[in-house]
Amino acid sequence: MSQEDKQRITVEIYNRKYHIVGEESERHMQLVADLVDQKMNEIHEVNKQLDTSSLAVLTAVNTMNDYLKLKEDYATLLGSIKKKED
């Protein structure tokens, strides 16, 4: 996809505006931004003393943890399906 074909939107995450460019739909990119904002606010509620940088890192760590769990679950499901097909 060429640079001209990419979607460009402005989103707000943790009370800051960001310009995002991507190949996904505007709706998808807005959903991603909304979920990041939600996760940052959830973590902030538990750890109000964190600065924005630390909060962003904890959000990334939590998100990657969730991603890896889902990836492992997906691999397990694929393995179960393959066994049933054999």
Swiss-Prot record:
Primary location: cytoplasm
GO CC annotations, alphabetized: cell division site; cell septum; cytosol; plasma membrane
Family annotation (InterPro entries): Bac_CellDiv_Activator, Cell_div_ZapA-like, Cell_div_ZapA-like_sf, Cell_div_ZapA_firmicutes
The organism's place on the tree of life at top rank: Bacteria
GO biological process terms, semicolon-separated: division septum assembly; FtsZ-dependent cytokinesis; septin ring assembly
NCBIfam families per the UniProt record, alphabetical: PRK14126.1
Family recorded in the similarity comment: Belongs to the ZapA family. Type 2 subfamily.
Descriptive protein name: Cell division protein ZapA
Organism annotation: Oceanobacillus iheyensis (strain DSM 14371 / CIP 107618 / JCM 11309 / KCTC 3954 / HTE831)
